[in-house]
Structure formats: C-alpha cells, structure tokens
Amino acid sequence: RPVQPKHFDQYWQAGILSWDSGIEMNLHGPYYAELLGNRRERNRSLAKMEASMQAGKIINARHLVYHVGPYGEYDPGTEANEQVANIFSGIVDRVRSIWGEQDEDAYTAFPWISEQEPSLVGIETSGRQELWGTVEEVLEVCNHVEGTVPVLNLGHIHARGHGSMRTSEDYAELFDMVRETYGGSKFYCHFAGIEHRMGNALHYTQIKKSDLKFEPFAEFLAEEGDWMDITIISDSPLLEHDAMYMMQHYDKARQRLMEIRARDERRIKLAKESGLTPEELELLEQEVAEAKTREEKEDSKSPAVTAKAPSKMMSFDSPEDDDDLF
C-alpha cells in the first residue's frame, strides 16, 4: 500500500528549490535492510523503502540509494546475486509506477514529472564481509537490471579491501574495471574517512584522521577524470567541512597538473630553440641540478669559521637606568 512520507511540505519545497536552482537531488534509503532475509524480513525492509521511493518523486531525486544487507542463508555467488537482481527489478518497477501516478494537478505541483525520467535505483557497495555488496556483485546485478546504477562507496571498498585504496593507480584500476564491466562514463560515489579492522568498516570519521586519503583520488580525477561525469557525496561526520576539503584538494590537484603541463610545454619550446630534443634538454637540466646539489653538499662539509668570543673584562661602569625604556 502507498506510504505517505512525513513532512511532505518540506520535501516538496526542497524539490521546487532544486528544480528552480538546477541543483541535483539524491536520496538515501534506509541504512539497514535485510533483502536476502526470509519473507518477513524482506517485506519489512521493502515497506521501509517504499516511503523513500515516494519521497524521491516529491524531491525529484535523480538517484535512490539502497543497501542489500547480510547474506543471510545465501552464500556469496550466483544464487545470491540472482535473488538480489529479482528484488531490485521489482523495486525499479515500483519506482516507475510511482512516477506514473499523476493527474493534471501533479504537473503543476511537480513540474519535473513531465520533463524528467524516474529516479535511478542505486545499489551501494558494502563495507563488511558478512554483507552482500562487493564491487563485483554490485556490477553484476546492475548489468542485469535496467534502471539500476552502481554506487561506489569508496570508504567501504577501502575497508573491505583491507585498506586497498591508497594511490591514484588504485583508483584508476577501480574505475577502469567499472567502465569495462558496466560501461558508460557516469559515476556515483560516496567518500569519507573510515575506521576499519580485518576487512570490516567500523565507522566513518573525518578524512584527515583516516588512512583513506582524498589526495590520491583528487590526483586521479585531475589526471584522468576528463572523460568522467562523476558525482561525489560526502559521508563524513563533518559533512560540509570535508565536502569543501575535497573540493579544495581537487582544485589544488588541477592546479599542479596545469603547472606540470605548462612546464613541459616550456621545455619543448626551449628544446626546439636550442636544437635539442625534449629528452636531451631534460637530461641536461638533471645534470645541472645534480651539480648544484653536489656543490651545496661540499659547502656544508667545509669547516665553519667561528668568531672568537670576546674576553670577559671586569667593568666598573654603573648599570644604566632602564626605567625609560617603556
């Protein structure tokens, strides 16, 4: 049965604001779910998800993000993935039917209904070994269910991989795998610092306190992200602070990349003017830098000349009156 979301007015106002200002809205469903549980547990989870599906229409959510929950009686593998695919196929159908329930008044209240597609259903990667949701599992289900998209929670992936996301190459490998398996250039991600142990996420933390650093991700985005249409959601306890922190580090990474490219362009130009190849000019610059380093080391090894301390002499001068110093 339909579940009327609470605080309807606030949801609707948020939808109108996002529509008028061009801000993309996304909505996260219940954080706890048991979609692989028995019928009672599954239906209870779906009933809670129903309210978020209706709220998604009211706020014009572009993505509705859901967790699957524990494996339950299933073992990781094909059977569990098929069950998840069947469940999410029904969820996609329900979302589309909610968006299709409309009348003439709805076009005025919800102008996006006639111009936007229904919300996409996001399936989020999990951060614990007992929960369904490895990257491979999520990609397999999304490939089989139209209307679903993978949600890459990078903190969860890092934790489940025993701290696997440490360099820009790690991110390149992950996104290349997603592109080859799922296709497309649109990506939806969550990012936050995370505490983890033995392949299990414990809790989110601010990015500065985590071994999951944003700088390598920013470096990857700056160098290879031109082909990507990516949305990054801050999951940090310091929500706005770490969102700005990520934006600043991405801007810094872009600036560094521009400086490197400008330097390389100058080197190529100088090489052409000098009649050298860029490689020969770079080798010459390295030799000059090494020679300068050797000179600095030799200068530091030479004995320093110390000034002779003045001999202490007995003075009979009376001390000056310092009362007028301040």
Region spans (language model):
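N-terminal pre-domain/capping segments
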Residues: 1-29, 35, 39-54, 259-325
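Well-ordered, non-membrane alpha-helical segments in soluble/globular domains
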Residues: 5-11, 49, 81-89, 168-175, ...
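Gly/Pro-rich active-site loop or hairpin
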Residues: 75-78, 132-135, 158-229
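C-terminal helical cap(s) of enzyme catalytic domains, especially alpha/beta-barrels
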Residues: 240-259
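Active-site beta-loop-alpha junctions enriched in small/polar residues
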Residues: 30-32, 69-71, 124-128, 155-160, ...
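Active-site acidic/histidine proton-transfer and metal-coordination neighborhood
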Residues: 20, 34-151
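Hydrophobic faces of well-ordered beta-strands that scaffold small-molecule active sites
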Residues: 25-29, 64-66, 121-123, 150-152, ...
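Short amphipathic alpha-helices and their capping/turn segments at secondary-structure boundaries
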Residues: 5-21, 50-57, 134-146, 169-185
